[in-house]
């Protein structure tokens, strides 16, 4: 039996969307295509530059931190104070779900870390010294969210421009039910990306796929 043009067109449209989703590196069409990037605008991949190199090193550091946390958890290695603190945050967060989980991690890490000048360091180093700047807070939250079970494709690091202070800043964006929530060391309030557009201009996006620049 032949199909109607409407049904054929609908299936073709679904096929095109699926192909586009695959090209974008998404895990499936359930991640809404118009909203796969926090703060909305399209982004352009960065193939080279300081941040690309930094992020490559940070991803390697996250793997090392993950192995160190696992060793502390299962192998009984000494000097695990930082890992134990991080694991407590993660386990307590797992008592919650969805927005409540990411809100817990945002608040817990904001309270555990003291504001201080900092650099790009791994999550365990952040918890070892318990201080750092927005990068340290963001890396620690990004790592904790992944360990708490949030899929990598639903996490982003976003470098933004704070319009009020005329300075660059880093936050974490976490997607829950197709809504991007912003984890920010400047506030305990968990607001959405759209609620932050008056305050922040997005500049760069960092995730498992690499570095992208907002157009």
Located regions from the model:
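A structural boundary/capping signal
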Residues: 2, 9-18, 25-215
């Amino acid at each position: 039996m032949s199909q109607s043009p409407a049904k054929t067109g609908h299936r073709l449209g679904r096929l095109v969307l699926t192909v586009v989703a695959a090209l974008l590196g998404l895990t499936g069409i359930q991640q809404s295509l118009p909203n796969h990037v926090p703060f909305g605008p399209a982004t352009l991949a960065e193939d080279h530059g300081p941040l690309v190199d930094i992020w490559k090193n940070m991803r390697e550091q996250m793997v090392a931190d993950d192995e160190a946390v696992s060793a502390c958890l299962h192998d009984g290695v000494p000097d695990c104070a930082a890992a134990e603190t991080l694991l407590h945050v993660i386990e307590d967060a797992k008592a919650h779900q969805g927005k409540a989980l990411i809100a817990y991690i945002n608040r817990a890490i904001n309270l555990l870390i003291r504001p201080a000048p900092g650099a790009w360091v791994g999550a365990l180093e952040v918890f070892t010294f318990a201080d750092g700047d927005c990068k340290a807070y963001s890396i620690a939250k990004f790592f904790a969210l992944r360990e708490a079970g949030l899929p990598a494709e639903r996490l982003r690091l976003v470098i933004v421009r704070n319009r009020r202070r005329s300075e660059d800043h880093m936050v974490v964006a976490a997607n829950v039910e197709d809504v991007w929530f912003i984890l920010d060391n400047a506030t305990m309030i968990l607001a959405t990306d759209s609620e932050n557009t008056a305050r922040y201009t997005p500049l760069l996006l960092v995730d498992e796929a690499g570095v992208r620049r907002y157009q």
